[in-house]
Every structure is written in structure tokens, then in C-alpha cells.
Curated annotation (Swiss-Prot), chains A, B, C:
InterPro entries: Hyethyz_kinase (IPR000417), Ribokinase-like (IPR029056). The lineage of its organism: Bacteria, Bacillati, Actinomycetota, Actinomycetes, Mycobacteriales. This is Hydroxyethylthiazole kinase. Pfam families: HK. It comes from Corynebacterium glutamicum (strain R). The gene is thiM. Substrate binds at residues 44, 192.
Amino acid sequence: MANSFLDSLTLVRQNTPLVQCLTNSVVMQFTANVLLAAGATPAMVDTPAESAEFAAVANGVLINAGTPSAEQYQGMTKAIEGARKAGTPWVLDPVAVGGLSERTKYAEGIVDKQPAAIRGNASEVVALAGLGAGGRGVDATDSVEAALEAAQLLAKRTGGVVAVSGAEDLIVSADRVTWLRSGDPMLQLVIGTGCSLGALTAAYLGATVDSDISAHDAVLAAHAHVGAAGQIAAQKASAPGSFAVAFIDALYDVDAQAVASLVDVREA
Amino acid sequence: MANSFLDSLTLVRQNTPLVQCLTNSVVMQFTANVLLAAGATPAMVDTPAESAEFAAVANGVLINAGTPSAEQYQGMTKAIEGARKAGTPWVLDPVAVGGLSERTKYAEGIVDKQPAAIRGNASEVVALAGLGAGGRGVDATDSVEAALEAAQLLAKRTGGVVAVSGAEDLIVSADRVTWLRSGDPMLQLVIGTGCSLGALTAAYLGATVDSDISAHDAVLAAHAHVGAAGQIAAQKASAPGSFAVAFIDALYDVDAQAVASLVDVREA
Amino acid sequence: MANSFLDSLTLVRQNTPLVQCLTNSVVMQFTANVLLAAGATPAMVDTPAESAEFAAVANGVLINAGTPSAEQYQGMTKAIEGARKAGTPWVLDPVAVGGLSERTKYAEGIVDKQPAAIRGNASEVVALAGLGAGGRGVDATDSVEAALEAAQLLAKRTGGVVAVSGAEDLIVSADRVTWLRSGDPMLQLVIGTGCSLGALTAAYLGATVDSDISAHDAVLAAHAHVGAAGQIAAQKASAPGSFAVAFIDALYDVDAQAVASLVDVREA
């Protein structure tokens, strides 16, 4: 059945995966609330003194260098080491990579440390693959379609899943390309919906790691969960303040059947 | 009268205590909004260059090492010095102590600097007392009952009040043990409800320091205020996004009588 | 026509100015959501390695030293250099200047680097002008009227616009003084409404820089937009949690005519 990937939503709620987020200060609160509403447990342990230790007990790790202090860069490097040693899946969100030189260099340095998934917008994925110059701040200037080659290149290089967020989302692994139509444009007007999707991707990977659900399906399910919640929120709210509230509510309320009926999945 | 502790709510609103929060980046915004809604004034002055100076003008200080950068640790140490010199009550929230070694060492180093109150979950309080290993990230794995001995030990050692948050809250000082039944499970699904309770505890201590209300009653009242607001919010909302909004509203709207009628206080 | 300044709201929505915010951790999320709701694009690029580079592509820069780490101070200095070199307008929000010695010294050091606008409360503006001692944390203890001389002094010294927030707002440039009556007292109970107004001021300046709208009118319009949204929110909500949601909604929904009909502008 085409929507079997949705079983992972049930696993997230059953396993309440502990997700360690090394992420930017702008979205920490929202990311934590997204994880809690979705059924996961957040912990923003990001200092070099603690991040490796914690990555060994976490079920998933998010690395998002959105506002990277020197100390947080060190914390990220340590967390990745800790995650790899412990076999904890980690997710790379290359925020604004391409657009800014220091973080581009940093992301290029960690992309080969086997992230289980990469999640970004088209311009970030294109830039991370070395195929383009990046977007405008956190906004993409490339189309999702234009990022397909870059995503495939990165998927092969990392052995992980690469997800490109946009009007339609693109989920790519070495031998599979899936398109997901879901969500609502209003998601762009609430800060942190993209960044927290990176964290939720880590939650889904952590919750399904011992199941027969593939990493590709887990990443797809995380995106479908967020997209469906965006659609439900858009039915209830038409401005971004109340939309953000309705979005968190919907992440919590929505069940797998509702997600399946709201989103459109297409294997390419 | 059993609920005389509730007079402190009135004092918070009259005195608008200035609460200096050295807290983690995840909950800064929510903590500030909780303080404002409850009637206090927040100021997150946390750098070593300014924290001691500010602790002398603040009415209460919160120390919560949830995402502790090296610089913030220094700021905390300075703030505690400034608070003690000025006689400003300070509150220790030992987030994830026990679970992570560096912050455990730090918390053990400051616990003897006479915090007016300690507020944590059962596992954190047990670990801080040296009686156990801590929880899972920010989640408790010990029951509140199991933390009674640790709370009493810490209360005697510090001369302050120790509050253990859980299904029922436990408020302990050297010669008194109070159980508080209040709140709603949904509070666990909104990030920062626990951390902001630490800040509100500092607000209540600061607002009542020159009154005849005991520190024990002030800490109890802070917990009752939050618990009652959680109950009111749960009557209005059944998912965490709208619950968080209703919780802030209820902190602002609720009066002492309503708190008294909603919570259940039991001296042990 | 007295309300011609309101054309700048249309320009903000047309041009979606990219606003680089070097601001305090407490209000980053709220500031980003305010900018998005108003029609701008936020980017919190604040490290010394990236801030100058980004200031050259941003349309406006906000400098708000609310929780200033040593690294963020360096980032601010670099961002101002980058902004000046590129001709990007930058806004100074002197949070708690006067009340705390280190940030006062820092603000005094950058005030002569030609901020396009300064936005603060009365006590902050008075202290920045060297005419008084500052307020209580982030709260003003001077009246807006009492800050007129300080605002005029700073406007002449910087060549920019100086805005004093209060019960009525005061917008001052070298040869013009405008009073704005708008807003609602509930705005004071939501953290970040003042700080995000600084960011929105940068958005308005950035969006109108190539138009025939004066910087004075752009700053005035930013304040009117926020004030009107506060008034609309106050019609829908009577407690700060739901007020904050309604405020973001109103920033998004309100059009120039509605702003004009809600606020009261008076040239002095």
C-alpha cells in the first residue's frame, strides 16, 4: 500500500524519540513545541562539553547552523562524533548554505560524516552539492525541480536521504525519488516551520530505526505529517498568528489516516 | 486559613517584581511572557559583564543552566554573587542535572550558595542531592514521592525551599512538607512551562520578601498559580498550541479565589 | 495628505525587504514572526564571521544589544561596518541603555556610526543622549515628553530619525517632530513588541530607501503599523496570550486605510 510509510507516525507517538537539537536560537522554542506536539521529546543540548555525551543517549540529532556561535560549531562537531560512535541518526539542515561563506565551509566539512538525512530548500541543497550559489538568506531562489540532480548527488555521496522543501517536497535516496504534495503557503509566514521539520525528521528516523520502515519512508512521513498539519491549520486560520497555533494543534491531533488522505505522494 | 498563601498573588501584581532570568535559550521568550502575564517584569541579563550589577537591582534571580555556554556559566556565577551581596533571593533550576556531567558538576558547586528555592523534577532533585543518577534529558524517571528524602536533605542543607514538580508537586522546607495537586498533563506538551515556573518562583519570592508571607508559602503560591492556569487552559483547549495561548491568558486572568478553588493543598 | 506616509506599508509588502537582526535571544522568534506577518523577510545573521557579509545583501539591519554575548558584540560591530560600506540603513535599539554600564558604553560607541534610526523608550533615549540615568531594566521611568530634547539632540547628532516609544510615540528628525497616538497597553504584556518594532523600522527603511518617502515617514509608518495592529488585537483579545496571536494576525491583515483610520498623527 502506497501509504504504508505512515506507520512511522504511530511509532513516533509510541516511542517518544528523544531528539537532540543543535539549532539556531530563532527557532528553538518553536522546534521544541513541534516535537512535543508530534509525540517526540526535545533536548537542546548544544555545548561542546555536553553534546557528544548526549548524542549517545538521544534517538536522533539535528544539526542546524542557523545562528552558529564559535562554541556551537564546536558543539556540533562533538555531537556528530558522539552520534556516529553511538549509531544515532543525525540530520543536517544546511540553513543559508551557499549564501554565506563560513557556514558553507562548515557544512561542506560535515556533509561527508554520513548524515542519515539532509533537509533544506532547493538553493541550499544545490549549494551544498557544489552546483550553485545559494539563495537569499533563508529563502530559496532555485526551484525544487532544479535541485533534483543535486539531491541525487548528495544522496549517493552520503548514503542517506535528501529532502528538498518547496511548493512540492522532493525526497531522494540513492535509488528512489518521491514527490510529496502537501502543506500550505502560510507555512512560509511562520518562522521555524522548515527548521522544525529538520528536527521532526530526526524524530522519525530515531523512532523507526529498529523497525522495517526505511529511512526514506521515515523522512517522507515526517514531511507528510508537517504538510498535513499545515493543510488542517489553513482550514482554520487565514493569518499567520492563529495559523501557527492551529499548526501545533494539528501536529498533535492528526492521525495517520488523515495524513494519508490529505497529502499526495508520487514515486518518480 | 489554609489558602492564606494566596495573598502573595496579589503582592506579585502590586509589586511587579523585576526578575532577572539567566535561563536557556529555548524558553526565554515563553518565560518572559509567563512573567508578564502573571504580573512580574522579566529581564534576561545574563552576561558576566552585567549580571552581578543587575542582580543588585532585581527583586529575584533565576539560574537555569539549560543550554549553558561558557560565557553564561560565568554570568551565572556573577549573578549569584551579586544576588547574595544585595540580598536578592535566587532560585536554582537544576535542568537535566544528573543526566549530564558538566552541568551536574556546576549545579553541585552552586547549591551551597544559599538559593532561596530550588525547583526541578524528581530526577533532578534526587541527582542534585547526590541520591540518584538523573532522568532522561529533561524528563524525570523518578516519582515525586521518591524525591521527598532528597528534597528534605537539600532544604536542610540550603536553608531554602525545595519544590519538586510532577503529577503532584511537593514543596519542602526544613520543617514543612506540602503537597499540591493542580495542573494538567497538557502542561508537559508546552516547552518552558517548568522552566518558567522557576522564574515565577523567583517573582513570588521577590514580591513577598518584605511581607509576612513565608518563602515556603510564596513558592507554593507560584506553583498553585501555574497549576490553576493549566487547569483553566485545559477547559478551553485540547491541543498544545491553543493550550499554550489559553495558559498565558489564564495566568493573567485568574484571581486568588479562583486559584484557591482549583488547587488542592495538603500539609504532610 | 496627512497619511501619505502609509504608502510605505504597500512598499514593504511589495519589496519584502530582507532584514538582518542582531538582537537578543528573548525576542528572536517573535521578531521574525512580526517581520514575516508584516511582509518582510527576517535573517538573524549575527556572528562576526558572517554579519558584515550579510549586511551587504540585507535591505536593513537591526542592532539590539539586549542579551549581548562577547561574540555578538563583535558581530554587531562588523554588521554596522558592512551596512555602512554597502549603504544599508541600520537601526539602533538601545535596550536598557543607562540602566547597565557595559551596554551603555557600547551604545555610546556606535551611536555616531550614523544609524538611520534609533528606537527606544524614553529612559533609553534620554540615557543615550547623555541626559539621564536610564530606566528599570527594560522599563522606562521617564515620560515620552521628557525625552523630546534628547531625541532632538540625537537626531541632529546622527542625521537620522529618533523614535521614542510610549503611551504616545514621538518621531523626531533634525527638522520635524511628529506625535503618534496608537497602540494598546496590552502590547506591554507581550515580550518583544518593542524590540520587533525596531526590526520593523529597519524593514520600512529598507523598503522605502529608493522611493520618495522620507526616512521620517518610513519610521512613522512602522510605528503606525504596529500601533494599529495592537488596537485591532485589543478588540479581539483581552489577555496577553490571545492578544499576541491576534497582534500577529493583525499585522498581516491590516491595510493602509485601516491603519490610517486607527492611528492619530500630529505634527508638532
